[in-house]
């Protein structure tokens, strides 16, 4: 039997946070007069470094620091609840001796906030790849390839769970099987870009995953 693993994005896949981030980034787009329609949707799945570089490069570094601090303060007051069925699905994977990794565009400071609120959350993963471990963020495949290397699993034997278009692209370009969660984007938007679309993890089994 071949060795396989499951790799999960965090926000919008394991944790129900994306609607909260919509509020923050919409306000930033308004505050700095970016004039980009649905700006909060365009940046989904990308790192803070990428967001600042791609959309706020016209601002001085001091203003970047203001945005960073505003985000940190916002994240400390966020609610980090589960996507339905996520934790139970991971439990089933581990019962089947399938390695589990988390691959997120969040940096270590954000993860520290999450792990403080969710004691033991970090302990369920065999590897964690954060923005601090990579030089090129999603949609580049570096993060997923690094996770596969950490776990000693060939990319073609990795299952990726993603909600954002940038993450879906990263998993696809890494040569992995991508399963899309219709949490951030409607199913119709991602259906032709993934092997399967699920609304959440309830009623989704390890056997179904392996059959894809």
Question: Across the structure, where does each feature detected by a protein language model lie?
Answer:
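Asp-based, Mg2+/Mn2+-dependent phosphohydrolase catalytic module
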Residues: 1-4, 107-108, 113-212
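Active-site neighborhood of HAD-like aspartate-dependent phosphohydrolases
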Residues: 1-41, 58
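Conserved SAM-binding loop
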Residues: 14, 41, 100, 136, ...
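Short beta->alpha linker loops
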Residues: 20, 43-47, 84-85, 106, ...
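Substrate-recognition element of Asp-dependent hydrolases with the DxDx(T/V) motif
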Residues: 25, 89-116, 171
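Helix-loop "lid/cap" segments that line or gate small-molecule binding pockets
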Residues: 28, 47-59, 114, 148
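Short helix-capping segments at alpha-helix termini
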Residues: 30-35, 62, 95-96, 119-124, ...
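Metal-dependent phosphoesterase signature
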Residues: 37, 53-91, 96
